[in-house]
Amino acid sequence: MVDKEKIEIAVRMILEAIGEDPDREGLKDTPKRVARMYEEVFAGLSQDPSEHLERYFTEEHEEMVLVKDIPLYSMCEHHLLPFYGKAHVAYIPRKGKVTGLSKLARVVEGFAKRPQLQERLTSQIADAIMEKLNPRGVLVVIEAEHMCMTMRGVKKPGSKTITSAVRGIFATSVATRAEAMALIGHQSPLRD
C-alpha cells in the first residue's frame, strides 16, 4: 500500500529544495497529484503478477504462442524516471497447458508497475511463466527507451535498450529461438 501522505510531504520538500514555492497556484496541488500518480505507477508492488497465470486451460496446441508489441511503462529504480517500450512474450505449451493471451499482458504490466531494472523485469516475466505454466520454453524480449538516458546524463533520445530472457527449449534450440526472433522481427543475436 502506497503511503500517499508521506509522498505528498516528500514532494513538497523537493519543491522547496529546488527553490520553488509549493504554495503557488501551479504547484499547490502537485504533491497530491504526484502521490496519486505513484499509487498508479507502482500498483504492481501490492500484487503478485504471476497469479494471473493460475487460470489456464488445456488445448490441443503445443506450438509456439507469441504475443508481441505489448506496451509497457515502468520506472527506473536508479533515478525514478520512466522507461517505456514494448514486450514480446513467447512460450511453447507443454501438454496443451495454455493461458489467456490477456494474462500474458497482465503479467508484463504487473511486474512493470514497480521500481524496476529492465533486465530484472525481463527475467521476472519469463520466470513467472515457467513456474506457473511449466511450458517447454519461454522467450521474453523487451525494447525500451529510458528517460534517464534521454533527458539527463548522456542525453541520447531515441536510443533503445533491448533485453531478452530465454528459458527451456528457447535456450537450447537455435532454430526455435530463431523462429521466435523472426516472428518478433529481430534476427536472433543468440547462439548455442
UniProtKB/Swiss-Prot annotation:
Belongs to the GTP cyclohydrolase I family. PROSITE patterns: GTP_CYCLOHYDROL_1_1, GTP_CYCLOHYDROL_1_2. This is GTP cyclohydrolase 1. It comes from Carboxydothermus hydrogenoformans (strain ATCC BAA-161 / DSM 6008 / Z-2901). Keywords: GTP-binding, Hydrolase, Metal-binding, Nucleotide-binding, One-carbon metabolism, Zinc. Toroid-shaped homodecamer, composed of two pentamers of five dimers. GO terms for cellular component: cytoplasm. HAMAP family: FolE. It catalyses: GTP + H2O = 7,8-dihydroneopterin 3'-triphosphate + formate + H(+). PANTHER family: GTP CYCLOHYDROLASE 1 (PTHR11109:SF7), GTP CYCLOHYDROLASE I (PTHR11109). One of its GO terms (biological process) is one-carbon metabolic process. It comes from the Bacteria. It holds the Pfam family GTP_cyclohydroI. GO terms for molecular function: GTP binding; GTP cyclohydrolase I activity; zinc ion binding. Its EC number is 3.5.4.16. Pathway: Cofactor biosynthesis; 7,8-dihydroneopterin triphosphate biosynthesis; 7,8-dihydroneopterin triphosphate from GTP: step 1/1. CDD domains: GTP_cyclohydro1. Zn(2+) binds at residues 76, 79, 148.
